[in-house]
Amino acid sequence: MGDIKKQKKKFSKPSHPWQKDRIEAEKEMLKQYGLRRKYEIWKTDSLLRKFLNRAKTIIAQRTTQSELEKKQMLDRLYSLGLLKHGSRVEDVLNLTIKDLMERRLQTLIVRKQLARTMLQARQFITHECVAVGHKKITAPSYLVSVQEEPQIRLVKPLNVVQQATLEKTEKEVKN
């Protein structure tokens, strides 16, 4: 059999540890998106940098291979909902970390009002109460594609889940 592949970090730490502006921006993002650790921000930032670097190399090169890579990258970004159809490669350079954070499963559950807070959405996901299609997802950082977005649903009828959904339906009945 083959050797086990060594796991690598999926992020890199900031180059300078004590930048006040960056630390404050990270704290705000932690609160806004209900994140537990700063490395979740750094992972998302690394993914964004990969997209940006690929876009820069594609723009610089004018080969048939770069055209193929351009089409593949744009299709992936369309499917993730980060770009709209008809966008160009140059539009990839305008993406921000907040665009990626808005496509996380945890954020979409709150936006669809299946949970009241980001932390409650995170709890639902880690306790296997959320499914996308027929598959339970246990990672709050799962990037949901546009096709999967309408298929997000709660699975387990926990007391907390029932209470949250009952409150939601009571609000709808009153209005």
Model region roles, listed by residue range:
Residues 115-119, 127:
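Beta-rich strand-turn-strand
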